[in-house]
Amino acid sequence: MHGALAAAVIDGVERAGGEGLLTPPDVDIAFYGDVFRKGSRRVRGDDEPGRVTDLDDELEQQLLLDLWEAAAVAEPDRVAAPTGEGTRAPTPLTAQRAMNALLRSRCMPGAVAERFLLGTLRQVRRYLKDNDIRRYAREAVTTRIASDTTVVIGHSLGSVVAYESLCVEPKSVGALITLGSPLGMPKLVFDRLDPTPSGGRAEWPKGIRSWSNLCDRHDVVASVKRLGPLFDVPGGWRTVNDQVLDNGWKVHDLGRHLTDEATGRAVIAALRLTHEG
């Protein structure tokens, strides 16, 4: 995993004109996915849902409906809009309708789309509601941040883990880069963050000097494309640099994000920021 991801980061930097700035040993990976596996020694295991009807938690069901709504807004030509489902409590029937609609979205990765989405929903729910999982995932991130770390990159749920890690256990790194992030998703993610947002604003991560947020225009996971209004420090002292990309048909794909020139530019800017002191 390290080799492929390191190569993708370096590719993005080189596309942005940073040839020779990074080598594979400069890139480290924080992995916490084992905590979600059934039989994990870290926490009590949990079955992965095999079908949409296995989503038995209200948070999972509501996340699915919110993704459906976001997909209908982003791709009205492909995804039919919900007709009042969002105003009622989720049911197995509406969850199935949401899944059927989402499978038409560009955000879903081909033949494994349903399995991917079901697993993602369960992981998000478990992270947000299980304190042991939350603590383990954040420790997996903070223990990999060294004194010479200049940028932290978080993708999808990993962006939530990275953000919370840097807030709860501040580290002096140059920059945070979030990719395909659900951080701005109201109520279900944003309002459940730690530290808890207040007055519609969340805390700026301590020790971070710059923050770039990138997502594809069709990415339903990153349903809120602009994080600035939610995380900027009043007065312009710190602002999120929000950018919308076009990842082609791999809308939410980590590799496509990392190799994008815009991500490379954000990494280069972080390296320069740290070098300039």
Give the label of every model feature segment.
Residues P24-V79:
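N-terminal accessory alpha/beta regions
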Residues M1-R44, A81-I153, L157-G277:
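Lipid deacylating catalytic domains
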